[in-house]
């Protein structure tokens, strides 16, 4: 999975890494163990549901306290499942928009001062299929499309202090 590969790349560069997970605790613990076995004390894990405001705030605060600086924020967490138009619900909307759009935006907002201090970077992971659309994934696509728009706006708004980009990898 892409988040793991990103973390391992940063491990190889000797960076400190905060690994966020929602429900994949075992995977997060194994990744942290892998990173810490090569670079002791450089990986921390934090559980948070990006759909819940208080958990996003806690993730921000814990992240600020782990290390002296934050050099990069990679918004890779995502919820992805089909929502055919005849089956959409408020719950689908809240989950898909929460993890794919709202969570990343509020993480950026909460961590921007630490990122400014280090002249850091933000990378938002989007989706290659946004321009053509994907049947049955309209809510997910709307959320990821919103994240692309936020990325463009914040790239201009924060340009003097923080580099903001989006990357849209293909299927993994």
Q: What would you call each of these model-derived segments?
A:
Residues 1-18:
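Canonical Rossmann dinucleotide-binding motif of NAD(H)/NADP(H)-dependent dehydrogenases/reductases
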Residues 84-85, 92-97:
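Substrate-binding pocket helix/loop in short-chain dehydrogenase/reductase
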Residues 76-81:
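Conserved NAD(P)H cofactor-binding loop of Rossmann-fold oxidoreductase domains
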Residues 86, 132-138:
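Active-site loop immediately N-terminal to the catalytic Tyr-X3-Lys motif
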Residues 15-30:
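Conserved glycine-rich Rossmann-like NAD(P)H-binding loop of the short-chain dehydrogenase/reductase
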Residues 108, 143, 151:
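Active-site helix of classical SDR
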Residues 113, 156-160:
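Alpha-helical segment proximal to the catalytic Tyr-Lys
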